[in-house]
Structures are given as C-alpha cells and as structure tokens.
Amino acid sequence: MAKVRAALDRITDPSVKAVLNEEAYSHIRPVLRESLTNNPYAIAPDAADTLEKYGIATNPFAVKVHSHGAVKSIENTLLERVGFNLPKEPCTFLFLKRSKLRYLRRGPSNNDIFINLAIEPRDLQRYEEDTLVESWTRITTRYAYISDTFHFFTRKMLADLFFHNPALDVLYATLVLPPEALHKHPSIEPDLYTINYNFNGFQYIPGNHGGGSYSHEFKQLEWLKVGHLKSPELCLTFQMIESIGANHLFMITRGIKITPRVRTFTKDSYVLFPQIFHPRNLNPSKPFPKVKAMQLFTYVKSVKNPTERDIYAKIRQLIKTSELSDYHPDEIVHIVNYFVFISKLDSINSYSDILSLPIWSKALLPIKTKITQLWEKLTGARAFNQLLDALQWKTFTYPLEVVDSPQPLQTRDCFIEDERLEIDTLEDEIPPNPNDNTSMSPQSIEEAVKNNPDLPWAPWLLILQAHNADCTEKQYDPENNLILPIQEINTLPKHQHPDIPTDLLTLLTKLHREPTTVSLDNHRARAYGSDVKNLRIGALLKKQSKDWLASFALKTENIEREVLMSVIHGAGGSGKSHAIQTWMRSLNRRDRHVTIILPTTDLRNDWTNKVPNLEQANFKTFEKALCQPCGKIIVFDDYSKLPQGYIEAFLAINQNVILAILTGDSKQSFHHESNEDAYTATLEPSIITYQPFCRYYLNITHRNKPDLANKLGVYSCSSGTTSFTMSSQALKGMPILSPSIMKKTALGEMGQKSMTYAGCQGLTTKAVQILLDTNTPLCSSNVIYTALSRAVDHIHFINTGPNSTDFWEKLDSTPYLKTFLDCVREEKMNEIIAAEEPPTPVQAPTTHFPKVNPTTVIESYVHDLPEKHDREIFSETHGHSNAIQTDNPVVQLFPHQQAKDETLYWATIEARLQCTSSEENLKEFHLKHDIGDILFLNYKQAMNLPQDPIPFNPDLWTLCRQEIENTYLKKSAAALVNAATRQSPDFDSHAIALFLKSQWVKKTEKIGCLKIKAGQTIAAFMQQTVMIYGTMARYMRKFRNQYCPRKIFVNCETTPADFNSFILDEWNFNRTCFSNDFTAFDQSQDGSILQFEVIKAKFHNIPEDVIEGYIQIKTHAKIFLGTLSIMRLSGEGPTFDANTEANIAYTHTKFNIPCDAAQVYAGDDMSIDYVASVKPSFNMIEHLMKLKGKPVFNTQTQGDFAEFCGWTISPKGIIKKPEKMNMSIELQKNINKFHEVKRSYALDHAFAYQLGDELHELYNENEAEHHQLATRSLILAGQATALDILDYGLRDLK
C-alpha cells in the first residue's frame, strides 16, 4: 500500500487529481449512505474510532443526537446480523418493538409474530400495545429471537421455553454483559460505556448516561460461560456468534453440538506484575496495560537515576486525563514502587560470556554456573537475575472457558396451552376528530353565524377552524379595509372516483376542497411537448434520447382527457400543504400510489423532512417525474413555479393518474421562461389557468405577524410584532433576497445564503434580508409579495445605493415596500447593558514532567548530519556558501545566513527575483483587473467593510504620517546615517538597493536540514517612498481594525495576551482545522494582487496621485539587473499589511468559509478552525494567478495542533512549540548568547509552563521531553520568576 500511496502522491496534474477524487467519492458516498442505516447518530470522535475498530462506520456528517448513540449503533448492527441469519419464513420476536424490523431487513410480508411481556413499568410504553401479553403464549415458529433481555433469564426459564415449545429449534439472543465485570474492572471500552460497582451488583451505563443504565447481579455474568444446558428432557448448545464491547449475540440450538471451548471478547493487552514485595498486599495487584508498562520500563532504564517523582510524572504523562478515574491511588503507589525497585537493578548480564573464554574454561563453565546458582539460592540472586525475575509479567486475559450446566434442570409448565397470540394488522387511517364532519351541515353553519353575527365570513368558520385558524376578530389593511380570510369563492360541482382512498376524500371534503373534473388544455400540453422535443427548455430533459423526446412530443400532440383535480390556493404560511402532509404521514412506507412533484430541490428536501415515513422515490423534481413512473394520485406543490404547460403534458403521458392536487398562491410569483423562442413563453401562467377550479382562496397566514401580514392584505393567525431594520450593510446569519440573479450568484459565491425575490417561494425563516437596488423597481408586485412574506420575526432592508430620494423612490415603485417605510424609521435601538465581569479563572494544578536525558534528544538530530560542504550551496564563481558554521554539532543544526555570503546572495537572487520590462508589468497589471475585482469583493465581504466607499479623512492621514515619522526617528543615529543615501532626493525613486537578510534559520522543519536553501532579500527603497506608502498602509489599517469581524484576528499591533484571549473565546477545537502553506508568497503576488490593492485603495479614497505613484513603483521597480516583475518586496512600506490583506482576499476567494469559523492572519501565515471547501468559481480563475497554496490539516488532538506565528493553538490557549523552544535554547547556549535572550524565552515559555497538569492533554511524548528540557534550562538560568510572573498577563486576560 505504501508504494501505491507514493505513486498517487507523485501525481500533480489537477485534472487527474479531480478524476481520482471523483472516483473515490463514488465509492465513499454509498458507504456513508449505508452507514446511516445502523448508525444515524452524531458520535464523539473517540467513540467513533472505537466503533470503526468493530467494523461499524460513522457518518461524519450525521447530526442526529442520542444520549448513547454509539451503543445504539452496536445494537442495530447486531440486529442486522440476526436478520441475515434468520430464514425468510415467519419468526417469533420476544421483547422487541415492531419498529426494529427495519434493522433486521424484514417487513410485513414475513408475517412475523411479536410477543412482549410487560415485566417492568416502562415496558408498557416501550412496546406496541397490540404486542403485549399478560402471560407467555405458545411459540409456533422454528426460529425465535430475544432482544437485549436474555441476561435477565434464569437457566430454568430458558429450559422451560424450549421444553414447552417443541416447534422452536433455534433461538437467537442478544445480551448486554461486560466481561470485565467478572473481575470488577473498569470498562475496557470507556468511550462506549462505563460500569459502577455497588450494592452487591453492578450497573452498566451506556454512553455515560445514567438514564439508560441497567442494573445487574453478578450471577447473571454466568451466561457468558454457558456452553451446554441440560435437563432430563432436552439439551441445549450455546455458541457466541458475535461480541462487540458489552453486547453479545448467542445462538442456542437443541441437541449436543460442538461449541468453542474458549470465548474471546478482546485481545490480551494487560499484564500482572510479579509479587516481589512482602507482604503480598503491598504489590500491584490489578492488570496494567502492557504498552504503558513497556514505556515505563524503557523510561526508567534510559534515564540516569530516575527519582520517585520522575516516575509519578511519567505515569501521569502516559495516562490520559479521562482515564485517571480508572486507577486507584494505592495501586499507582505500588506501581511506582515496583518501577523504582527495578530502576536500581543492573540490566547488564553479570555472567561470563562464552566467546572470550579458552576451551578448558568453556568445559568447566557448566559446573561453575551450577555452583553459582546454588550459592545464589543461599545468599540471594544477583541484581541481573533479580531484574529478570521482576520482569516475569503474567498476561492477564478476559476470555472464558465454557462450562456445562452443573446439574440437570427440571422443567415446569409455565406456558398457556390453549391461547395463541393474534397479531392484528394496523390499517392506515386518521384518528377520529371529535369535531370531524364530512360536510358542513346547515345547523352548524347557522350556529356559527349566530355566535358571530358581525363577521362576514361566519359561515366559513368551521372550515377555518379545520385549518387551525381562529378567525373571530377583524383585521384591517393600511387603507383601513377589512381583510377577509376567505376570498375568490367559486361554486363548482363535486366529483369522485372509486379508487380515491376514503380517508383522503374525507379530508378534502372536511376542508371543502372536493375534487372537480377539469378538461386538459391541448394547446398548453402541445406547446410544452414541442419545447422539450426541440431542446428549448429543461436541463435533465435535454439529456434524454431522441427517441424518448419524439415519443414524449407525440403523446402530448392531441389529448382529450378529463382529470379530477383539487386546486388549493392560499397565502404563504396558510398551511395549504399541511393537511396533505398529515395524511401522507399515516401511509405505509412502501406506499407508491402517491407522488409529489416539486419545482425545486429545496422544496423536495423540505417535503422529505416533513414526511419521513415515505420513501424518497415518492418525491420528485418536475423533470425527473417525466422520466420515471408515478403513482395514481399526484400532488403538484407550488405549481405556479412549474413551467407553463407542464401539468397538462404530465397528465397526458400518465394515463394512470386519477386525482391531481394542486397547491399554489395566485398572489406570489410564477414561472418565467427565459427563452423567448420557447412556445411556453407565450402561455398564460398556470395559476391563472386553474384559478377558476379553486373553490376558495385561503387568505390567512400562520407565518407572518399581524403588522406585516395586514400590510400585505393577509389575515394573520399569529401574535406579536415584526422587527424592521435598514442599513447599507448585510447582517450575518440571515438569508439575503436579491432582485437579480447576478447579485444572487455573487453573494452565493461569497458564502452568503441568497435567493432571488422570485426564487425564495417556499422559504420560511425567522429573519430575512431584502436587498434593494436599481433592479427592485423592475420587479412585479407578485415577486415583491413573495419576498416580503418569507420572514417570521425580522426583516432587514439593505440599501446598496446612496441614502437619498433615489432610495425612497425605489420603495414607491411597488405597492408593498412603501408600507414599511415608517416602520423602518421608527425602529428603536435596543438598550445596551454592560456585560458582567468574567469570573477569575482557576489556576491549573502544578505538575512535574519526568526527567529526560538531553544528550539522547540532541543525538536524534545530529547523528544523520552529513559533512559541511555536502550541505552548502556551491557556485563555480564564488565557491561554497558559509551557512554551516563551527564544528559544534548543535550549531550545525541551524543554518546561519549572512549578508556577506556572496554564494548565498546570488542563489537567493536567482531563486527569489525575476526580471522583465515595465511594459510587460503594465500589461500584466491591466489584464488582471477582473481578478482584482473578485479578490476585493471577497475581501470586502470577509472584513465586513461598508457597502459605500469610505470618505477620505485628512486628519487621520496626517496622524498616520506622524506615527510613521516618529517610528522612523526612533532608530539609532548610526542607523539613520547608514540610510543617508536613500534619504537623498537624488536617489532614483524606482531604484532598489538589494541586501541579503542575516538570520539564524530556526524553523522546526528546517532544523538539521540536509541542504542549504536560498535566503531572503531586503529591498531598500527611497526613504520618501517608504514613508508615503507606509502612511497609506497605516491609514487603511485603522479602518480594517474598525470593521474587522469578531471571528477574524489579524496579528498586528497586538500582544500574545490578545491572541490568547481570541483563541480561548472564539476557536472551535471540536473539528479539524486548516492552514494554507503558500509557495513563494512574495514572488507570486502578480498583477492580480496589485489590482486588488489599487481597488482597495480607491475604496478608501486614497488620493489619486498616491495610488498612481504606487502603481509606478510596483511596475517600474528596478535593481542592478533590470526591472523586476510585479511582486511583493520587503522594503515597500506596506509589506506586512499588504501581505495580510492579500492573504485574506485570496483565502476568501478560494474557499467557502462560514461566518462562525474563527480565522487568524498575519502576513503569509493563516489558520482557520474549519476545513472549508473550494468555491467552484475559483477553478475558473486559478490558472490566471501565480499565487498557490497547499492546504495543511490538523486534527486538533494531542500532538497535532495548528501553528501560527510561532505559536501552537491549543484548547488551553496559545503555547510555544516545545521542540522549537528547546532547540532554540540549545543554539543560544552553544553560541554563548543565551544570557541575552533567556528572559524573552521565559516569557514565551510561560504560556505553556503555567498550564501545569493540563499540558498532559496537549503534548505527545516527544513534545513533553522537549518541554521538560526547556523548562529545566530556563530555571537553571534563573528565570523561574519570569515563568511565574508572566508579564503578558495570562492570569488576568481582559
């Protein structure tokens, strides 16, 4: 597999990788779908890993929560195993709910029998009432199954069960008994279940949830050992078929058969230490994990003179915090004493070797050895023999030897001979309603009118009540007109069909929606058929074969057909589909005589969620419904959004349809055909065609509050008020409705949930945002009505244009928007309440890390280092570079790049810089305008910048200029004198003085690198240029800090305490995080990044001459070799800010990043606590950008956390990577500079040091060793006070 993986890693072609990913996904998708059958739960990662060990997959996208979902998935898996073993003939199920049949892969056709005896009170609500019996009844099938109750049986009960049911041959039984309970040990699978021992028994607790626990007696554990059960009349044989954790599946058959002699529940992974102390009770007595025992043994033998405290610290390091409760303090004390003892014993063989002895000594050696052994028996064994005896660990095992019943059992008659359980089949019917009437009687109408004489709709009150609407008060629209809940009444004949289900017909009659006969319009069907045949419309239909298209058009050519229809019109939120969905929820899962046709995938998903009992094949999008068989009853939901002529064409080709139910709203938007050449584009909307066949329009809503609904002319059955707000910016977490598809697409690409005004039909949400722009006046009243009726509680208007009379003219353009004008203006600000002071954090308990041998740690780095010149860069002109210095192996681990190194200087120029011409740079700049625009739109959305350009503030610009000048003047006089040349007005404003940066390379991945790589350049611009564009960067930084979202942290002008506070408050450690490792970040910032910077500067209204000057220096920058290509240079002035903002723009252009994802940025460094998917649009522009990023993923588990700016991001806060810290200290020691940096190192190290015992949850063994060495070095250097004080204020973060 390693060679296959290596071959795949060598593939770099993106198209080939895409094919491989698609192929892999095609295999992954069915596995994930199948896993939801037995394990539909959201499982904790550790429990999911345990389940995977047992072959049970967990869908990482599952969101269903269960208190002990992992154990439930085991139960379901065993049920599936039982179902595979059972024959297709009828079987008897004892103590099993009928709903569990789906896990057994069985259905009603198997005619299975259910017998459930109510033994405890909760059995009455656990099992179906028709399966409960007061006493046992006869089992007449050959196979039976007892579900998770068998452990409560006695042996005699089981013998009686077989004796009195001669037809029963095979009994499958599942029982829940943890084998470790035989030894009173803690759970061997603590991620799945735990065990309490008390009251002379034990409690099995699944998922650590006490509410689902079972109390057991120790005698019940004997079932795990039973091999044969004998009585005078029969003999039963037991065989364990499957064992997963504490759940076991047994097969019990008649007769004496062979069964395995040993039952294995788990592999042997524990050992018992020998009894080396007296008295015996002062020795370790409980099993200890063998892996941890070996780790402790090798530790005490690898460290010189380990102390008792060191061994305690090592044990604490090896045992997870979550596992500490499984150990007793006295047992830990005995284990420590055991290892202290063997640490003092000599492990060097003290006996004579035979290789160095002469021949006569070899002949006498056995005699000498025998005498020595006799002497040691008298005086005591040598230290080496003592060690070997002390290491005779005994393997502890949980497997059991099976036993037979100790004595024959006497059976007794405990079954009823003359009774047999009768299983009644449930009929699909709606429970009777006390107010249910098949029609409105004259008496009921008369009574309603009498009780409500002032209501014009009093005769309709019973029908309104059937829609859960209590319309007994009057409501008025803004013009003070009375709003009628029932409108557009049509008197129509009532027709029936004998095949329509009675309960459905009763429901329609109750709602006064009886079917009526409708003649199909041949012209509409023919127009749709022609458009489909000639590929003018459709997406899926265009992929059908020519024969299918021709056949479809022929079937729609001439139709003369009448169909029963129930047309249901009503306002948004009136519950048009609610009654139909309620009826459908009473149907059998495999019922196929009803098909629901939906205009959109979102609406289809909504129906499948609301009617989960039917298979998804019953719900079809409209195009797929034409290509697949359908039922005899069709529901066209939101049919106004279906293409014109679709309904007629569908009914023309599906002659089996006996009833069509149409639901829609004549006040909302309808389907618009964008292809003007299509015949269907000239047809009138379907809502108009079928409105005459609707008996009445239900003008009520359960969705909108009265203040909103009444303005729309709709009667509200809800209470409360709607909140209206308006601003020029979008709010987070709310869908946006836009008037155009273009805006909707752009917003969607930036991760914002968006829909068009017309496309939001069917949406119901707590709050919605409505985007107002120049396209709003072009929208029809129906479309505006659709958008305004989506929200339940809050509507936020986004005005992207100037806040002037032009904006209010937009509101005047439609009849609805104007009514909300006053509401927006009168909205009051919520009172701001100061937050309470956070409680003082509790200081972590101190800890002690085990002693580590520093020589051993350093040796792992230096033993593979090649000779100096094999690592250096060689140039024929300048010879070898000089980055590897001194003969000290520790110093040689760290390359030292120096400005005077000519070989490295030219190698850096060749690797980092590329020359071209100013004309090519300008061409590159202008060709990348569109990409720069996309980058800025994503940056603007990510950083929450205002919609309108930011007005220029001269005072703020002056302030930023002063800050830049003050910072520059803080340099020493010598530094200012050295830069005198660049301060001269004669210095070319486009010229760059180039230097090699002197530095020690201390990155963790570069420690001990085998080959020296190119360094970094410093580009020295004219000082006036640096000052101007440094001012520009600082000016825009002020606004970036002002608008920066809470979830984004930019590490600029901040302290480690600020960063630490952000991580603790915002970072999510419950998922994999993501970083972007850029390749040649500075060199890759081409014309697209420059365009982004220019657009960003113009948005901040930076003076035009400053922007033009910036373009000049970026496109005309030159060194002694010629003009440089457009790239980022270190001495520009805005380098750090520009890099950071380019990083943000690129990341948000490439990835779909949710608003709740915490993000950190600094230059080319970044990390996000979420694995974001790549936007489809990025694939279209990726090849046009030089900037490339390689994703790096961290699981955020022990030893695998994200790194950012030299800090490790952990659940306890930020900490320095211990490996880098320790190795940096070693370098400073060996170059005699440690005294200069020890305090700053101590202050950084304090973030980890003060976490104390919590570090065991963060560090792996290697990191713990480096942490111990770094801590020891700093304390010996006198920095204990700095480690405790922590000047950054970690203990009092604000």
From Swiss-Prot:
Q: Where does ATP bind?
A: 570-577
Which domain of life does the UniProt lineage start with? Answer: Viruses
Q: Which residues form the RdRp catalytic domain?
A: 1071-1178
Name all (+)RNA virus helicase ATP-binding domain ranges: 541-698
Q: A Pfam family for this UniProt protein? A: Vmethyltransf
Where the record annotates domain (+)RNA virus helicase C-terminal, the positions are: 699-832
Q: Where is the Alphavirus-like MT domain?
A: 59-224
Q: Name one GO molecular function term.
A: ATP binding
Recorded catalytic reaction(s): these are: RNA(n) + a ribonucleoside 5'-triphosphate = RNA(n+1) + diphosphate; ATP + H2O = ADP + phosphate + H(+)
Q: What is its EC number?
A: 2.7.7.48, 3.6.4.13
Q: Name one GO biological process term.
A: viral RNA genome replication
Q: Which InterPro entries match?
A: (+)RNA_virus_helicase_core_dom, Alphavirus-like_MT_dom, DNA/RNA_pol_sf, P-loop_NTPase, RNA-dep_RNA_pol_alsuvir, RNA-dir_pol_PSvirus
Sorted alphabetically, which keywords does the UniProt record give?
ATP-binding, Helicase, Hydrolase, Multifunctional enzyme, Nucleotide-binding, Nucleotidyltransferase, RNA-directed RNA polymerase, Transferase, Viral RNA replication
Q: What does this protein do?
A: RNA replication. The central part of this protein possibly functions as an ATP-binding helicase.
The entry's family comment says:
Belongs to the potexvirus/carlavirus RNA replication protein family.
Q: What is this protein called?
A: RNA replication protein
